[in-house]
């Protein structure tokens, strides 16, 4: 037995990143693994996507520094609305000890510093997919 589940459901991922190149790279990783991505360039676009879907996403993959807010605030809004994703991953150029602690306090499961090691992200997405009910 390989240790892999027989089948996993694709994750519904809310991807929030204002940098076009980073957004495309992250989207490509998720799509290559077969996941559904809902892409926003800023916090308010992300909140609009969540409102239109009217259900929690499996995973939030968000930059911390956004033009109209930050990833910490976004996760707080989602949590307060009862729409917190099962997993939340912060991706940022902000990588001080204080930033990492703030991400943890906000409820992020991981905080990756840019540039992101895509193999590590792939492993976390695979692990998250195994945890989602069919």
What function would you assign to each model-found segment?
Residues 48, 72-85, 125:
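Short amphipathic alpha-helix used as the core "switch/output" element in two-component signaling
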Residues 39-59:
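Acidic, metal-coordinating helix/loop segments flanking the phosphotransfer/catalytic sites
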Residues 42, 70-73:
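Acidic catalytic/metal-coordinating carboxylates
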Residues 20-39:
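Two-component/phosphorelay signaling modules centered on CheY-like receiver
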Residues 63, 92:
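Active-site residues of response regulator receiver
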Residues 67, 96:
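The feature encodes the CheY-like receiver
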Residues 1-14, 20, 27, 117-134:
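Non-catalytic signal-transmission and effector/linker regions of two-component phosphorelay proteins
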Residues 114:
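A Lys-centered signature of the CheY-like receiver
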């Amino acid at each position: 037995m390989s240790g892999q589940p027989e089948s996993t459901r694709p994750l519904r991922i809310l991807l929030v990143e204002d940098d076009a190149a980073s957004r495309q790279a992250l989207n490509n990783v998720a799509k290559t693994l077969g996941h559904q991505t809902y892409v926003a360039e800023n916090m308010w676009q992300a909140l609009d996507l969540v409102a239109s879907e009217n259900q929690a996403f499996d995973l939030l993959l968000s930059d911390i520094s956004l033009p109209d807010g930050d990833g910490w605030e976004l996760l707080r809004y989602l949590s307060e609305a009862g729409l917190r994703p099962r997993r939340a991953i912060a991706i940022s150029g902000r990588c001080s000890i204080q930033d990492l602690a703030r991400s943890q306090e906000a409820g992020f499961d991981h905080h990756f510093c840019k540039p992101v090691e895509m193999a590590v992200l792939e492993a976390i997405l695979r692990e998250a997919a195994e945890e989602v009910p069919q």
